[in-house]
Amino acid sequence: MAFLKKSLLLVLFLGLVSLSICDEEKRENEDEEEQEDDEQSEEKRGMWGTVFKGIKTVAKHLLPHVFSSQQS
């Protein structure tokens, strides 16, 4: 009977250790995914800034020509 108790405790202990390791790996994977998402959102924000600067530059050069052609 004592042998069965020890075996059962050993199985439960090994199961808990295995479960703990799996949970830790899962958390690490989730952290990596969050970091990738953060990097992608930073890239998108940077891209929008570049787009707005480009639009501003184009508008700055085109608007004087549009207004001068309307006055003529």
Swiss-Prot record:
Swiss-Prot/TrEMBL keywords: Amphibian defense peptide, Antibiotic, Antimicrobial, Cleavage on pair of basic residues, Secreted, Signal
Residues spanning the signal sequence: 1-22
Any one Gene Ontology BP term: defense response to bacterium
GO CC, alphabetical: extracellular region
Expressing tissues: Expressed by the skin glands.
Pfam families found in the cross-reference section: FSAP_sig_propep (PF03032)
Keyword ATP-binding: no
Biased composition (Acidic residues): 30-41
Origin: domain of life: Eukaryota
Family per record: Belongs to the frog skin active peptide (FSAP) family.
Protein name: Caerin-regulated peptide
Organism: Agalychnis callidryas (Red-eyed tree frog)
